[in-house]
């Protein structure tokens, strides 16, 4: 039971905080007042989409935007775009000559946010590729000139391929660079008992997320930090 009598009825709630009121306080006090107008517009447009649960939360968008500025990221990659909220957060953070290689299997969703991204004046930073990411990653890895060239890589896509992505992008991110894996607390399901009520998609991907978390914790090539922001994000800093 959460504060004020609020109870999450099932695993699959967007906020990991036990108090909806506390999460709303964070949004209204810290996030929404400082949210760029373009990100607000895209967030509101995305909220009308039937698959709006796929979007990056506003607090995570704020976090990513600041993180990219702190590490002075310039060459970045995003696997899984949806309507482009996190992509826009990235594009606004990196310098004018920065680049984002963005990949998603559905261009139609990306085009929902594209007019807003264009209006924000950052579309020139984005190279969008429609289709599965693994073939593109294999091609990049094959050319050793691409090794260690990315400052930041954000993964928010098919959870059953996260480990396959990690095997490839670990070579592409520079030593000292960051990889961010989204949804690593997966609606809180990572600590839920097997018989807990879960939405079908949450239950399906749960074991893949658990497998990823164990693999990242055991990978000596990275330092990690798992944060309860949004639906959980694990930051991996490459050290070798």
Curated annotation (Swiss-Prot):
Top-level EC class as recorded in UniProt: transferase
Q: Which reaction does it catalyse?
A: (E)-caffeoyl-CoA + S-adenosyl-L-methionine = (E)-feruloyl-CoA + S-adenosyl-L-homocysteine + H(+)
What triggers expression?
Answer: By wounding and viral infection.
| UniProt keyword terms in alphabetical order | Lignin biosynthesis, Magnesium, Metal-binding, Methyltransferase, S-adenosyl-L-methionine, Transferase
InterPro entries per the UniProt record, alphabetical:
Cation-dep_OMT (IPR050362), SAM-dependent_MTases_sf (IPR029063), SAM_O-MeTrfase (IPR002935)
Tell me where on the tree of life, at the top rank, the source sits: Eukaryota
Instruction: For this entry, list what GO says about its biological process.
Output: lignin biosynthetic process; methylation
The residues that hold a divalent metal cation are 156, 182-183
Cofactor(s) the record lists: Mg(2+)
The note describing how and how many cofactors are bound reads: Binds 1 Mg(2+) ion per subunit.
Protein residues bound to substrate? 14, 156, 187
Per UniProt, S-adenosyl-L-methionine binds at 56, 78, 80-81, 86, 104, 133, 158
Q: What functional role does this protein have?
A: Methylates caffeoyl-CoA to feruloyl-CoA and 5-hydroxyferuloyl-CoA to sinapoyl-CoA. Plays a role in the synthesis of feruloylated polysaccharides. Involved in the reinforcement of the plant cell wall. Also involved in the responding to wounding or pathogen challenge by the increased formation of cell wall-bound ferulic acid polymers. Methylates 5-hydroxyferulolyl-CoA more efficiently than caffeoyl-CoA.
Q: Which family does it belong to?
A: Belongs to the class I-like SAM-binding methyltransferase superfamily. Cation-dependent O-methyltransferase family. CCoAMT subfamily.
UniProt protein name: Caffeoyl-CoA O-methyltransferase 5
């Amino acid at each position: 039971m959460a504060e004020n009598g609020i109870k999450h009825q099932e695993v699959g709630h967007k906020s990991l905080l036990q108090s909806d009121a506390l999460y709303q306080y964070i949004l209204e006090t810290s996030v929404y007042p400082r949210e760029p107008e373009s990100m607000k517009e895209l967030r509101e447009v995305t909220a009308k989409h039937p698959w709006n649960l796929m979007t990056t939360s506003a607090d995570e968008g704020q976090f990513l935007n600041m993180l990219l500025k702190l590490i002075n990221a310039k060459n970045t990659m995003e696997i899984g775009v949806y309507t482009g909220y996190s992509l826009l957060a990235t594009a606004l953070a990196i310098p004018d000559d920065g680049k984002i290689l963005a990949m998603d299997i559905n261009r139609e969703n990306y085009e929902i946010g594209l007019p807003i991204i264009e209006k924000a004046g950052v579309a020139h930073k984005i190279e969008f590729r429609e289709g599965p990411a693994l073939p593109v990653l294999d091609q990049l890895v094959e050319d050793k000139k691409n090794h260690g060239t990315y400052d930041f890589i954000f993964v928010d896509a098919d959870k059953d391929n996260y480990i396959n992505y990690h095997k490839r992008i670990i070579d592409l991110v520079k030593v000292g660079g960051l990889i961010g894996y989204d949804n690593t607390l997966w609606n809180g399901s990572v600590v839920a008992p097997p018989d807990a009520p879960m939405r079908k998609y949450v239950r399906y991907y749960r074991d893949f997320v658990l497998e990823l978390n164990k693999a990242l914790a055991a990978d000596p090539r990275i330092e990690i930090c798992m944060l309860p922001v949004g639906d959980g994000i694990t930051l991996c800093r490459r050290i070798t």
